[in-house]
Amino acid sequence: MFPLVEFCISNMAKGGDYVYDKLENDPDVDVLEYGCLNNCSVCSCGLYALVDGDTVEGDTPDELLKNIYKHIEENDFTNLL
């Protein structure tokens, strides 16, 4: 089972699309895009994604990507089988 990273399309327009594209090319991560994830207070403040339901944030696309991988590693989602 791979970790699921979910993106709000509005947040992708702020730079999250870069992170989405990077993760989409990672065979060990599943990514989904939604019209809205109902996290408007988080979305309006900066970049974020949901990693298996947990909010992960970053000030820049590179920081968000780094924080997503850090969250995945710390929670070891790859060993849930």
From Swiss-Prot:
It comes from the Bacteria. Transmembrane segments: none annotated. Belongs to the UPF0349 family. This is UPF0349 protein SH2012. It comes from Staphylococcus haemolyticus (strain JCSC1435). The lineage of its organism: Bacteria, Bacillati, Bacillota, Bacilli, Bacillales.
